[in-house]
C-alpha cells in the first residue's frame, strides 16, 4: 500500500470501499478494499484462486486488474481507473442514449463478455454501475468474477439491497445452474435501459421482479420453457400474463435491434443467444 497515496473515497460497492489513488509516477488507479466477512479467518484460498484468474483477463473492454495486495487481514485490488459509469451517464441522458452510442456500448459489452465466457468466467452481477466509460467512448466491464470469488451477497454491506433488476428469471426462481446465460439476460436488460433511458424491470423484491418480467414477456409454462415447473420457486398459481408486443415498451429501437433483444431476453435460459452469436447479429451489420 506504500506505493499509493492521495487516497480519495469514490464509492462503496457490493464488496467493499473504492478509492482513487496515485502511485509514485503520478498514474491514477482505483483501489478496491475488500471487506472480509470473518476477519479472524483471513482470506479463503478459493478467493485468492478466483482473483488470480481475473489477473489473467486481458481485454480492451475489461477493466484491468493490475495488482493484488493481501495481508492476513486485508485484501486490496488495484484496478485501472475510469471517470464515469453507465448509470451516471443514463441519469443525465433523458430518454435514453442516441442509437449509435447504445449500439457502440452494446458491441463493446458483448466483446468483453464473449472473451470471458470463452474462458469460462462469468460475471454474475452485470448492471450499469459495473460498466465504466472513458472520454473516448470506450466501455469497460468492472468487477468481473468478483461475484464468484466472494459469493453473491443478498444485501450490500451498507444495508442497501443488491439490485435485482438485471437478474434472470431462472435465478429468481431458485436455479442453481449458473451458466453464461445469466450474463446474457443482464446484457439484454442493460440494452433496453440504454434505449429507453429507464430500467425495464425495476422490481422491489424477488416476487415483484418476477411479476414485472412476466407482465411484459408473459408467464412461462412447460410448453415454452421445458422443466420450468421443476425450479424450486416456481409457483403453479403464478398470474398468467400474455407477452406484450416488443414495440409497446421499447422506444426507437429498429426491427433488427428488437430481434436481438428478444433473443437475449428469452425466459428459458437454454433458448438465449450466446455473446458470440449476438456479435454476429444483423443489428451490428447496419449503419446508423
UniProtKB/Swiss-Prot annotation:
Mod. after translation: Autophosphorylates in presence of cyclin cyc-1 but not in presence of cyclin cyc-3.
Residues of the active site are 125 (proton acceptor)
The answer to keyword Nucleotide-binding applying to this record is: yes
Q: Which GO terms describe its biological process?
A: cell division
Q: Which residues carry this modification: Phosphotyrosine?
A: 15
- PANTHER family under this entry? CELL DIVISION PROTEIN KINASE, CYCLIN-DEPENDENT KINASE 5
Q: Which family does it belong to?
A: Belongs to the protein kinase superfamily. CMGC Ser/Thr protein kinase family. CDC2/CDKX subfamily.
From the Swiss-Prot or TrEMBL record, give the protein name.
Cyclin-dependent kinase 2 homolog
To which species is this protein native?
A: Plasmodium falciparum (isolate K1 / Thailand)
Amino acid at each position: 500500500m506504500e506505493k499509493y497515496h492521495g487516497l480519495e473515497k469514490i464509492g462503496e460497492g457490493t464488496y467493499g470501499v473504492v478509492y482513487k489513488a496515485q502511485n509514485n509516477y503520478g498514474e491514477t488507479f482505483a483501489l478496491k478494499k475488500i471487506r472480509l466477512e470473518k476477519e479472524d479467518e483471513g482470506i479463503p484460498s478459493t478467493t485468492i484462486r478466483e482473483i488470480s484468474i481475473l489477473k489473467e483477463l486481458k481485454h480492451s473492454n475489461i477493466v484491468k486488474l493490475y495488482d493484488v495486495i493481501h495481508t492476513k487481514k486485508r485484501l486490496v485490488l488495484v484496478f485501472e481507473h475510469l471517470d464515469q459509469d453507465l448509470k451516471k451517464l443514463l441519469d443525465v441522458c433523458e430518454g435514453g442514449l442516441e442509437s449509435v452510442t447504445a449500439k457502440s456500448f452494446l458491441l463493446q459489452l458483448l466483446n468483453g463478455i464473449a472473451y470471458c465466457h470463452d474462458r469460462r468466467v462469468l460475471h454474475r452481477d452485470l448492471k450499469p454501475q459495473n460498466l465504466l466509460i472513458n472520454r473516448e467512448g470506450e466501455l469497460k466491464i468492472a468487477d468481473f468474477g468478483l461475484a464468484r470469488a466472494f459469493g453473491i451477497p443478498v444485501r450490500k454491506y451498507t444495508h442497501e439491497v443488491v439490485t435485482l433488476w438485471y437478474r434472470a428469471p431462472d435465478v429468481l426462481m431458485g436455479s442453481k445452474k449458473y451458466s453464461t446465460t445469466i450474463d446474457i439476460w443482464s446484457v439484454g436488460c442493460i440494452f433496453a435501459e440504454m434505449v429507453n433511458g429507464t430500467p425495464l424491470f425495476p422490481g422491489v423484491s424477488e416476487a415483484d421482479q418476477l411479476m414485472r418480467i412476466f407482465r411484459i414477456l408473459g408467464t412461462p409454462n412447460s410448453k415454452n420453457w421445458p422443466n420450468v415447473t421443476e425450479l424450486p420457486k416456481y409457483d403453479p398459481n403464478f398470474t398468467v400474463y400474455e407477452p406484450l408486443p416488443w414495440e409497446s415498451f421499447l422506444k426507437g429501437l429498429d426491427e433488427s435491434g428488437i430481434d436481438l433483444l428478444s433473443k437475449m431476453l428469452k425466459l428459458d435460459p437454454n433458448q438465449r443467444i450466446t455473446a458470440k452469436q449476438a456479435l454476429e447479429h444483423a443489428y451490428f451489420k447496419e449503419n446508423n
